A protein has these predicted regions:
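Residues embedded in well-ordered beta-strands
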Residues: 4, 57, 118, 139-141, ...
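An extended, acidic
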Residues: 13, 157-162, 166-348
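N-terminal subdomain of lithium-sensitive/metallo-dependent phosphomonoesterases centered on the IMPase/IPPase/PAP
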Residues: 1-124, 157-160, 192-195, 232-235, ...
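Generic detector of contiguous secondary-structure segments
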Residues: 26-49, 132-140, 239-258, 278-279
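Buried hydrophobic packing segments
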Residues: 43, 142, 284-288
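DPxDG-like acidic metal-binding loop motif
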Residues: 99-106, 114-184
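Residue-level marker of motif borders
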Residues: 31, 117-120, 150, 275, ...
């Protein structure tokens, strides 16, 4: 199952088109590109084709609404060309019409929930990073009775070597990682293009950092200030005695990098009112958990993927190894308390 997902998703082909494409704006002002739509259409089309016997349910980020407007003909045409080129290079004879593309995108309209099986797709996670030429990920997971049982994370711009090393060794030039995990079977990483790498000729099992002293830990957070509260993560890091500056990268590549021990902690504290979506965390969550991490909200509760499209959680998402989690949780809760009731100065 995982194997055919690997061979079909070729994000680098999509990336080339992205560089020439217009970036559209969704109704919530967030960006979406032909690559987001193309990736969703492709993954949805292939999954449905490969799983004919199963009742197919896909919860995916994008929908075809804006593409059906009169002004979107050109963009739709580009997505169609991109998809047909990719299918042709994969030996597929069928040429898809514009309507086929829209239908494939809209296959991702399922609401998910606690019953049965649902695929969960973020066709391009970290679109802002993608547009900037930074990190992004293609994230696919499978829910079974509300639990994530499989996750695949393609990170086309992530170096195969650890990003913890600041010296730009030659292996930093080799980019493109594929992480995958199935429940109870660990997490594996291989090069995205299938080429051999001296460290990972085929696939290697990866593990999170075993650091026990928080002063030696480094932490990941979003690149985008709008996606997390830097002042809060700064306060948590100070309480833990973390010396290294934060590593700010886009997308679920953070979960992938964490799963192989490039850093020890991931902190995500969205601003008030933001509701996290399952496709932003499902694949990353199983990839990092199967590598030995604990993922929880600020109350210490595991993420619940059974509630539909949204994660219903108490403030924030935190990830680290089992040893560090109790210390991290205390630092998080102390910092949140202080942020909600800042200490008052002495009265005059
Ligand atoms: N205000 C906000 N707070 C937290 N996350 C947000 C946000 N606005 C958008 N996001 C989500 O953050 C994701 C990117 O996360 P990161 O900051 O780790 O790169 C986006 O995924 P997409 O790029 O798939 O839309 C989007 O779903
Ligand atoms: Mg988006
Ligand atoms: Mg996303
Ligand atoms: Mg996305």
């Amino acid at each position: 199952m995982v194997e055919w997902v690997h061979t079909r998703i070729h994000p680098k082909k999509v990336q080339k088109v992205l560089l020439q494409s217009d970036v559209q704006s969704k109704s919530d002002k967030s960006p979406v590109t032909v690559a987001d739509y193309g990736s969703q259409a492709l993954v949805s089309y292939i999954l449905e084709k490969e799983l004919p016997s199963e009742s197919f349910s896909l919860v995916a980020e994008e929908d075809s609404g804006d593409l059906r407007n009169d002004g979107s003909q050109e963009v739709l045409q580009r997505i169609r060309e991109l998809m047909n080129d990719t299918l042709a290079s994969d030996g597929e004879n069928k040429v898809l019409s514009a309507e086929d593309v829209l239908t494939a995108i809209d296959s991702g309209k399922s609401e998910g929930g606690p019953l049965g099986r649902h695929w969960v797709l973020d066709p391009i996670d970290g679109t802002k990073g993608f547009v900037r030429g930074h990190q992004y990920a293609i994230a696919l997971a499978l829910l079974d009775e509300g639990k994530v049982v499989l996750g695949v994370l393609g990170c086309p711009n992530l170096p195969l070597a650890s990003i913890a090393n600041t010296d730009q060794s030659s292996s930093q030039n080799q980019v493109g990682c594929l992480f995958y995990a199935t429940i109870g079977s660990g997490t594996y990483m291989q090069s995205l293009d299938g080429s051999s790498h001296k460290k990972s000729p085929v696939a290697i099992q990866v593990h999170v950092s075993a650091i026990e002293n928080p002063a030696e830990a480094s932490f990941f957070e979003s690149f985008e200030a709008a996606h997390t509260t830097f002042s809060l993560s700064g306060s948590i890091a100070t309480k833990l005695g973390v010396k290294a500056p934060p590593v700010r990268i886009d997308s679920q590549a953070k979960y992938g990098a964490l799963s192989r021990g490039d850093g020890a902690i991931y902190l995500r504290f969205p601003h008030k009112g933001y509701r996290e979506k399952i496709w932003d965390h499902a694949a990353g969550c199983i990839v990092v958990t199967e590598a030995g991490a604990v993922v929880s909200d600020a109350a210490g509760k595991p993420l619940d993927f059974s509630k539909g499209k949204f994660l219903d959680l108490d403030t924030g998402i935190i990830v680290t190894n089992q040893k560090l989690m109790p210390l991290l949780l205390k630092a998080v809760q102390d910092s949140l308390r202080e942020a909600s009731s800042p200490p008052t100065g002495p009265s005059l």
